[in-house]
């Protein structure tokens, strides 16, 4: 087969604050010929996750993205050429494909999916959504980090995002007595209760007193706070946690674009209410992804 090319987004410069059109650059690159055990994949979708933001500016648990390097992310694609006996042309696969239109990759670095699983409302993007990193983050955050028990009340920030929305639905399926989501618009809040199965929602932009709104919506307090935001919202949520409450720290949306992180300031309740807070990286549970996806 003749020479093939890919279009790829790379990091042009490190952003100060919110990334803009100067942060990224679109390049075209030739793809190499296949070697044994490799496949050529046409990428159909790639993810854009808030958790990718820190690596654009600084060192993280996955390292800092070097200037001029591909933006890394999960992706979905179709095998168009193969020298791997386990993968055929036309197979749907996922992997760490990054922001590019195609790539040559070792077959063992791809996960093959059955297209029959994705029908009706379950679109192929579920493979990198509810069954991908966002879904796994929700699952292990609730089950392994927060230790959700039957009948408990769960409060979730950024609840209309991929992680938050999945966490809310999973919490109900895992036996939570009440699940409350925090979002930033009436439309998002309406969706949480009408479509996503949340018991109540809070529009933090409209709340006259966010702490009172949290306390009222949770029915007097929460056992678990699933934190995707950090900042002032975290400090406020700490005040409404019940004795022995747990905080699972999944993300820090309020902190990612700050040059100097605000950090947590409300620490006394950790003593008086015997609270615990634990951060986690979902990749620590990667060997358990398969069984978790089957249960989901």
Predicted regions and their residues:
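Mid-domain Rossmann-like dinucleotide-binding core that forms the NAD(H)/NADP(H) cofactor-binding site
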Residues: 128-207
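Short amphipathic alpha-helix with an adjacent loop that forms part of the alpha/beta core around
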Residues: 208-219
């Amino acid at each position: 087969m003749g020479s093939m090319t890919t279009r790829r987004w790379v990091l042009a410069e490190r952003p100060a604050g919110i990334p803009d059109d100067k942060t990224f650059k679109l390049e075209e690159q030739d793809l190499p010929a296949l070697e044994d055990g490799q496949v050529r994949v046409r990428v159909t979708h790639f993810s854009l996750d808030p958790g990718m933001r820190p690596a654009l500016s600084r060192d993280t648990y996955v390292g800092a993205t070097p200037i001029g390097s591909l933006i890394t992310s999960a992706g979905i694609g179709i095998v168009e050429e193969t020298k791997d006996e386990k993968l055929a042309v036309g197979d749907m696969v996922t992997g760490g494909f990054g922001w590019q239109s195609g790539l040559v990759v070792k077959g063992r670095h791809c996960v093959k999916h059955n297209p029959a699983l994705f029908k009706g409302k379950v679109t192929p993007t579920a493979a990198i959504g509810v069954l991908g990193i966002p879904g796994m983050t929700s699952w292990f955050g609730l089950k392994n980090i927060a230790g959700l028990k039957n009948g408990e009340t769960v409060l979730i920030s950024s609840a209309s995002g991929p992680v938050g929305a999945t966490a809310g639905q999973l919490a109900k399926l895992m036996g939570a007595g009440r699940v409350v989501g925090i979002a930033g618009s009436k439309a998002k809040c309406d969706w949480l209760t009408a479509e996503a199965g949340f018991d109540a929602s809070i529009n933090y932009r409209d709340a006259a007193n966010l702490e009172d709104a949290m306390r009222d919506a949770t029915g007097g307090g929460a056992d678990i706070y699933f934190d995707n935001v950090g900042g002032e919202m975290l400090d406020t949520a700490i005040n409404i946690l019940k004795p022995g409450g747990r905080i699972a720290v999944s993300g820090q949306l309020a902190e990612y674009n700050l040059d100097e992180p605000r950090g947590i300031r409300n620490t006394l309740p950790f003593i008086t209410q015997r609270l615990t807070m634990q951060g986690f990286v979902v990749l620590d549970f990667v060997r358990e992804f398969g069984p978790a996806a089957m249960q989901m």
